[in-house]
């Protein structure tokens, strides 16, 4: 599911100072004494239990962070991911989001891939209905969100979103940006987790 982010993207997001890195390491080791974060722990952080769509979405994020594909997140992968999420530019975050959405890794997002992601996000964001509404306050179904995104972003009408269409569509339209990035509100999520857990 999805592709991995590159170390170059994480590095381009900004440098981490040594003191901050040491603090992250202490917290990581306290929470993950084995030195690795497993899928079930990752899901627990997102409070994902039995919901299939939300579970698939979180698994996609996990795989995007799991650079070497060993089904765990080690400290270096953790740091690279946090650096990208917390400090990355809008373009880096959109590229990373695109890679999560592109489940089959073919470089394009089709309607079914986007629908699966939007359904998962709806499950994760049940309490945040505001984020799922249009400018007029209308709550759209996942299918309506996908239709509207394709209408606004699929420039060549081929039924697939390329990376360029994805990034440019988000830059052009505020609503599209909100919909394409509604999973990428990691700063507030991480702030909540910092209060609840020593992990972050």
Swiss-Prot record:
The keyword Lipid metabolism does not apply. The gene is GUCA1B. A lipid is attached at residue 2 (N-myristoyl glycine). It comes from Homo sapiens (Human). This is Guanylyl cyclase-activating protein 2. It holds the Pfam family EF-hand_7. The keyword Metal-binding applies. InterPro entries: EF-hand-dom_pair, EF_Hand_1_Ca_BS, EF_hand_dom, Recoverin. It comes from the Eukaryota. Ca(2+) 1 binds at residues 66, 68, 70, 72, 77. The N-terminus is blocked. GO terms for biological process: body fluid secretion; cell-cell signaling; phototransduction; receptor guanylyl cyclase signaling pathway; regulation of signal transduction; visual perception. Binds three calcium ions. Keywords: Calcium, Cell membrane, Cell projection, Disease variant, Lipoprotein, Membrane, Metal-binding, Myristate, Repeat, Retinitis pigmentosa, Sensory transduction, Vision. It is found in: Cell membrane; Photoreceptor inner segment; Cell projection, Cilium, Photoreceptor outer segment. Ca(2+) 3 binds at residues 154, 156, 158, 160, 165. Residues 14-31, 53-88, 89-124, 141-176 form the EF-hand domain. Coiled coil: none annotated. Stimulates two retinal guanylyl cyclases (GCs) GUCY2D and GUCY2F when free calcium ions concentration is low, and inhibits GUCY2D and GUCY2F when free calcium ions concentration is elevated. This Ca(2+)-sensitive regulation of GCs is a key event in recovery of the dark state of rod photoreceptors following light exposure. May be involved in cone photoreceptor response and recovery of response in bright light.
